[in-house]
């Protein structure tokens, strides 16, 4: 019976090693807060972008106002995920699909918040699956009462797995990207720009790998247990 227990312990150790080698896996998920309104200076600069890792989150906060602000002075947006052409031309009609709608500027519970998890796989039929090393694009378009068209847009680059350092911790870390310095990792010229369509079943993930020395050590211990 002790041999069986030790065998199960060795198998469990191997399973932990495999889980730890999943691409882009981190002990702590980073959350990036984006305040979606025309007064955000990052949108005014015209090159609003963030770099994320798999399993990180994007939190979009809609415009919010006090009750004393008239409706015609508030901002409302419909946000779309688009491809690169839609991002460049700010065209959501034929280049993307609707993601969220900021339509409650006087919400009594504070600003509306929408979250996007950059995950490899999604259980939802209309969910979106993200791939490391690719760019994704969000835009919104609103037409104020004066007829002037405004466009806010955001570019998200999903870092390759080897550039996402593993961290230790149990709580999500929150970044306000409006105050954050410029990202240190820029997409390379051959970065793949993802099409703006929900992913369904495209499960082309990398195969987890275990370090050779660790695997050999565990196999040796397992053999010794069987001999005893």
Swiss-Prot record:
SUPFAM superfamilies linked: Cupredoxins
InterPro entries: Cupredoxin, Ephrin, Ephrin-A_Ecto, Ephrin_CS, Ephrin_RBD
Record Pfam families: Ephrin (PF00812)
Gene3D superfamilies to which the protein is assigned, alphabetical: Cupredoxins - blue copper proteins (2.60.40.420)
Disulfide bonds: 62-102, 90-151
Membrane topology, record value: Lipid-anchor; GPI-anchor
Tissues of expression: Expressed in a graded fashion across the tectum being more strongly expressed towards the posterior pole.
BP GO annotations: axon guidance; brain development; ephrin receptor signaling pathway; positive regulation of peptidyl-tyrosine phosphorylation; regulation of actin cytoskeleton organization; regulation of cell-cell adhesion; regulation of focal adhesion assembly; regulation of GTPase activity
UniProt keyword annotations, A-Z: Cell membrane, Developmental protein, Differentiation, Disulfide bond, Glycoprotein, GPI-anchor, Lipoprotein, Membrane, Neurogenesis, Signal
Propeptide, chain numbering: 204-228
GO cellular component, one term: plasma membrane
Start and end residues of each Ephrin RBD domain: 29-162
Sugar attachment sites: 37
Signal sequence residues: 1-20
Subcellular location: Cell membrane
GO terms, molecular function: chemorepellent activity; ephrin receptor binding
Lipidation (GPI-anchor amidated asparagine): 203
PROSITE patterns linked to this entry: EPHRIN_RBD_1 (PS01299), EPHRIN_RBD_2 (PS51551)
Function, as annotated: Cell surface GPI-bound ligand for Eph receptors, a family of receptor tyrosine kinases which are crucial for migration, repulsion and adhesion during neuronal, vascular and epithelial development. Binds promiscuously Eph receptors residing on adjacent cells, leading to contact-dependent bidirectional signaling into neighboring cells. Induces compartmentalized signaling within a caveolae-like membrane microdomain when bound to the extracellular domain of its cognate receptor. This signaling event requires the activity of the Fyn tyrosine kinase.
Assigned protein family: Belongs to the ephrin family.
Protein's name according to its UniProt entry: Ephrin-A5
Species classification: Eukaryota, Metazoa, Chordata, Craniata, Vertebrata
